[in-house]
């Protein structure tokens, strides 16, 4: 059974996460405020960041950078800037 939340990223009612995807207070906030659709958008940006910046999830500094980018993207409305990437025209 899916749960419905008000997604603060999409600014509308949407299907919520099935379980907490991220640890700690940020994880609780994601679970309560970020929909599956918004999380999917973040995962796409995260993958691009990891690949383009050659981040290693074994490196603590890289994980901190990724976490900050995630908070900026999901909660502060800042898009992820990836050097050299031009989004396809709509």
UniProtKB/Swiss-Prot annotation:
One Gene Ontology cellular component: cytosol
Pfam families assigned to the protein according to its UniProt record, in alphabetical order: Iron_traffic
Statement: the UniProt record of this protein carries the keyword Iron: yes
Annotated keywords: Iron
Record keyword Transmembrane present: no
InterPro entries referenced in this protein's UniProt entry, alphabetically: Fe_traffick_prot_YggX, Fe_traffick_prot_YggX_sf
GO MF terms held by the record: iron ion binding
Biological process annotations from GO: cellular response to oxidative stress
Family annotation (PANTHER family): FE(2+)-TRAFFICKING PROTEIN-RELATED (PTHR36965:SF1)
HAMAP family for the chain: Fe_traffic_YggX (MF_00686)
Protein role: Could be a mediator in iron transactions between iron acquisition and iron-requiring processes, such as synthesis and/or repair of Fe-S clusters in biosynthetic enzymes.
Subunit structure, as described in the record: Monomer.
Family per record: Belongs to the Fe(2+)-trafficking protein family.
Record-given protein name: Probable Fe(2+)-trafficking protein
Originating species: Yersinia enterocolitica serotype O:8 / biotype 1B (strain NCTC 13174 / 8081)
